[in-house]
C-alpha cells in the first residue's frame, strides 16, 4: 500500500509541476509560439515599427473559428509593436521572415482579456492563430 501512495504522490507532483510550468509563476499562461513553416532565405526579420502584411485564421481553443483573412484573400496590414493589434500578436510576430508561418496560442491576458470581444470571443478566452507573414515593409528611422 505504501508503494501505491508513493506512486500517486509522484504522479500528482509531476502533474502539478507541468501545470505550474504552463501557467507561469503568477498563475498566468504564457504566449506559445510554434513555427509551422520556415523559409530558407531570410534577409530581414520583422521588428517593432515594421508594417506587416499577414494572412491569419483565428480560433478559440475548442476550434471555433472567429475570424480569417483567407476567404477574402485580403491580407491584414498593420504596424508591429505599436498597439494596433493585441499584445499576443505584437509579441508573437517579432523576428518572423517573409513566407514564414506560425501558430500562436495567446492567453486572454495578451488577447481580449476578461471582457472578450462579443459576440464571437468570450471573456477569458485563449486564442489560437495560424499566421503567415506575406510581406515586411521596413520603416526607416527619421
From Swiss-Prot:
UniProt topology in membrane: Peripheral membrane protein
Xref: Pfam families: FKBP_C
EC code: 5.2.1.8
Entries under InterPro entries matching the protein: FKBP2/11, PPIase_dom_sf, PPIase_FKBP_dom
Gene3D superfamilies per UniProt: 3.10.50.40
Catalytic reactions on record: [protein]-peptidylproline (omega=180) = [protein]-peptidylproline (omega=0)
Domain PPIase FKBP-type positions: 49-137
Keywords: Endoplasmic reticulum, Isomerase, Membrane, Rotamase, Signal
Disulfide bonds: none
Keyword Membrane in annotation: yes
Subcellular location: Endoplasmic reticulum membrane
Cleavable signal peptide: 1-21
GO molecular function: FK506 binding; peptidyl-prolyl cis-trans isomerase activity
GO cellular component: endoplasmic reticulum; endoplasmic reticulum membrane
Regulation of protein activity: Inhibited by both FK506 and rapamycin.
Tissues where this protein is expressed: T-cells and thymus.
Entry keyword Membrane: yes
Motif mapping: Prevents secretion from ER: 139-142
SUPFAM superfamilies to which the protein is assigned, alphabetical: FKBP-like
Family classification: Belongs to the FKBP-type PPIase family. FKBP2 subfamily.
Subunit annotation: Interacts with ARFGEF1/BIG1 and the C-terminal of EPB41L2.
Task of the protein: PPIases accelerate the folding of proteins. It catalyzes the cis-trans isomerization of proline imidic peptide bonds in oligopeptides.
Protein name: Peptidyl-prolyl cis-trans isomerase FKBP2
Organism this protein belongs to: Homo sapiens
